[in-house]
Amino acid sequence: MRSKIEESVRNESRTAIVSGNWEIDEAIRLPSNFTLILEDAHLRMADGVYSNMFVNEHHGTDIGNTANGTDRNINLIGRGNAMLDGGNYNGLSEKNHSRDGLPPIWKNNLLLFTNVDGFKVSDISCRNQRWWALNFIYCVNGYIGNIDFCSNDTAIDENGNVYHGLKQKKYADVLVKNADGIDLRQGCHDILIENITGFTEDDSVALTALNGKLEQTFAVKGLSSDLCNVEIRNVRTAAFCTNVRLLNQGDVKLHDIVIDGVYDMGDESPHIDKGLFAVRIGDTRLYGTRHATEDETYNITVKNVCGGGNYVLSLAGSMKNLVLSGIEAKNGAKMLKDDRTV
């Protein structure tokens, strides 16, 4: 695959098409002004490796943490049956990563873009992600659409018995934890996310503006850390945690977000008993140095939501200019878990 990419750059077509079955054992770097088309292609992570499947060209480099190292106009497009498959779980988790010779947990993202201006990821199925499937940090002017997920639903009980189908009261049994679908982190803005389906072990779409080790590693000098100007439309997923989650803490702003159309499909999924929330904004738990203020979480619109988990909505912390409309509950779900402080 790397040779196809290199050849398309040399001949200046800057578009490569791959088909068939591929085993990936190290990250494929996508250059600027480039389109990779996966046409009836099944890309599977090799057993036992600790690696992303795709990263942008300057990801993880010194210049990649500067405005001069911004990669631009990268497209990953599926045609027909295009699949990114995490394969067999490699055991790397949030509890054991970065210890005893293990790499950081973000090596388990199927796709990790950092400092990219102009991108499109669409018409792809993601299966068996080993952590978050699609992760974006300091990425702007992008489109993520027509993505279908199916996380690993394996659980192992206290006696070592393996079973499938996740249950809220047996979270400790879950093999692959925090297997989100799409994550936008700090510095992301002007992005449309739409038409998201399938099953995720944790959040299906998460806009999480924190300032942890991940964000500090890939922060871009001189650029704003705000997570803003994002629209999320038509999310129809079964999420063991939350269909759409928003969270910011520790001086990072989250604002000007529109969520329009979230339908909790948990009651129709064989993978979970039910989820927690359809939409969740904020958290009572502290992830950073402090909770956000209302001047850091603002201008958020949530409309046309139907939830059937524990609650339809969860609101926590401080926020202002929050607009809610068209919120419905099904299957006896409670409407609102309200832990707001303002």
Identify what each model region corresponds to.
Residues 1-342:
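Extracellular/periplasmic carbohydrate-active domains that bind, remodel
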